C-alpha cells in the first residue's frame, strides 16, 4: 500500500498542542510506511492568515525535526508558489468539473426552512451559476450532503480547495 499523507495547518493562529500531536502521528506513520508526506498550508482565509503564523509553521516543524517530501520549503517559497489565497483562478477552473448546481440560499434562509441541514431547495430550480451571486453545491445522493464548493463571495470553499490540492 502506498501511503500519501499531508500536514495541513491553517495559519490563523500559532500552532497548538493538537497540531503538534497530529503532526507527530502523521509524520511517524508516513515515515514508517515509507510514504510521501506533503506540507499544505491552508491559507484560504486570507483575512485571518498572518505572516508570523506562516513562519511559525516552518519554525515549529524545523524545531521538531520533521521533514516532508512535497510542498513549500520556507515562508517565501510558500507565498510565491503555494499560497491558496493567490490561486483563486485555478480553483475557478475546477469548480464546475464536479456535478453540481447553483444555489442562492443564504444560511439564514436554510435555517428558516430546516434547522438541521441544507434541504436541497435549489436542486431543481435551474439557476445559472453567477460566481459573485450564487454558490456551487456538489450534487450528492442526499441533499444534506450537497456541500458548497464555491461561495457567493466569489471565492472557493474549503472543500473544493482541499479536494483540488489532494488530487
Regions from the PLM with identified roles:
Residues 1-119, 126:
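N-terminal Rossmann-like or analogous alpha/beta NTP/dinucleotide-binding catalytic cores
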Residues 105-167:
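Active-site cores that bind ATP or allylic diphosphates and position pyrophosphate for catalysis
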Amino acid at each position: 500500500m502506498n501511503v500519501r499523507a499531508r500536514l495541513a495547518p491553517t495559519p490563523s493562529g500559532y500552532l497548538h498542542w493538537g497540531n503538534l500531536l497530529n503532526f507527530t502521528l502523521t509524520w511517524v506513520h508516513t515515515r514508517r510506511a515509507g510514504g510521501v508526506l506533503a506540507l499544505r498550508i491552508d491559507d484560504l482565509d486570507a483575512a485571518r492568515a498572518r505572516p508570523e503564523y506562516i513562519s511559525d509553521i516552518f519554525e515549529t516543524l524545523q524545531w521538531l525535526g520533521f521533514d516532508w517530501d512535497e510542498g513549500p520549503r520556507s515562508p517565501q517559497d510558500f507565498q510565491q508558489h503555494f499560497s491558496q489565497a493567490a490561486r483563486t483562478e485555478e480553483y475557478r477552473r475546477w469548480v464546475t468539473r464536479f456535478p453540481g448546481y447553483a444555489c442562492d440560499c443564504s444560511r439564514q434562509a436554510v435555517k428558516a426552512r430546516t434547522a438541521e441541514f441544507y434541504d436541497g431547495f435549489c436542486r431543481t430550480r435551474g439557476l445559472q451559476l453567477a460566481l459573485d451571486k450564487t454558490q456551487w453545491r456538489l450534487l450528492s445522493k442526499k441533499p444534506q450532503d450537497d456541500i458548497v464548493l464555491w461561495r457567493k463571495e466569489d471565492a472557493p470553499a474549503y472543500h473544493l480547495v482541499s479536494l483540488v490540492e489532494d488530487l
